[in-house]
Amino acid sequence: MKILVDENIPYAHKIFSRLGDVQIIHGRKITAQIVSSYDALIVRSVTNVNQSLLEGSKVRFVGSTTSGIDHIDDHWLEKSGIKFSYAAGCNAIAVVEYVFTALLLLSQRYGFHLRDKTVGIIGVGNIGRLLYQRLNAFGVPTLLCDPPQAEISTIGEWQLLEKLVTEADVLTLHTPLTYHGRHATWHLINEDLLSALPSTKRILINTCRGAVVDNVALLHALKKGKLLSVILDVWEKEPNLSLSLLNNVDIGTAHIAGYSLEGKVRGAIKIFNDYSKFLGAIQSLNVSAFLPAPMIEYVRWHGVINEEELRKLAYLIYDLQFDDILLRRNIHKPHGFDQLRTNYCERREWSSLSVGTDNNISTNMLNQLGFKSILI
């Protein structure tokens, strides 16, 4: 089997070479001519997989190591008899910890307490649901908005978007990008909705897809003095994002919210397992076999873990401000945005840190937040 794999998938050769001959390539450089002779294609979100890319090729299996599939024409793949697999939820932990770290950063910067703010979660799939659980574990009030989920789920009280934006202090977006239908999300956050935000300061976080927010309308609102702190990990027209918008947001990063090492390996192994099943050569790999020891493995903490202590623990693992600085320094360089993603550090998840505490309440809370905590 010949397998073409995006170079941003960690351990790609080590993982997929068990199933065939592997060729590594930049995801944006995959063309119909290049892919035509391969049996399988393994991609991330920067590669649009559709009829124009694959028609007439030998490809019989497509895997995306991402949780979203708006870059995949899965209907055409099914019609063409091409097996498709993706890694739903593989990066949920990473995105949730990015958002939590962002909130801890802003609470420090602007002098508020998270438990005094209400977080509106827009989109309650794998990521939104996990964020809801972790915020609740820390005692942060939440509101939920997801019309499709509201019809089938009972995890909480559901709000209409128009009501949520007037009541929540924080709006964090976790929807897929869809252009059609009753619940289309393209430009979900638009000029009208931004105008409807209360005059008191609000926070907007987008880690799903850039076009869920109308970037032009957002920039216009910020330039007009809208009291809005903005954290953007995703942008319209990536990698050619609006420099004016970047200059007006609190934190900007290069579409790396889901880029934990655990999340990327989790996604790759999900596709590996599915492809091996497709080939009838059943093999199974575990994430832990590919993870190196973290830089900091264990800390001891005395007493109750409050917001300041949680912030210190989160900062031990991930420095969000550094990613913001890197984007601002490199965005003017040729291919700067993509280079940041290609050469991204081995960011770890909170579960990589063991925390010994002498307080049972702290131990339980830290475990609910994703750390490994033991009572000592």
Curated annotation (Swiss-Prot):
Pathway: Cofactor biosynthesis; pyridoxine 5'-phosphate biosynthesis; pyridoxine 5'-phosphate from D-erythrose 4-phosphate: step 2/5
EC number: 1.1.1.290
Major place of residence: cytoplasm
Localisation: Cytoplasm
Binding site for substrate: S45, T66, Y259
UniProt-listed Pfam families: 2-Hacid_dh, 2-Hacid_dh_C, DUF3410
Catalysed transformations (reactions): 4-phospho-D-erythronate + NAD(+) = (R)-3-hydroxy-2-oxo-4-phosphooxybutanoate + NADH + H(+)
Top enzyme class: oxidoreductase
Active site (record annotation): R209, E238, H255
Binding site for NAD(+): D146, T175, D233, G258
Entry keyword set: Cytoplasm, NAD, Oxidoreductase, Pyridoxine biosynthesis
Source species, domain of life: Bacteria
GO BP term, example: pyridoxine biosynthetic process
Family: Belongs to the D-isomer specific 2-hydroxyacid dehydrogenase family. PdxB subfamily.
Subunit-structure text: Homodimer.
Function: Catalyzes the oxidation of erythronate-4-phosphate to 3-hydroxy-2-oxo-4-phosphonooxybutanoate.
Protein name: Erythronate-4-phosphate dehydrogenase
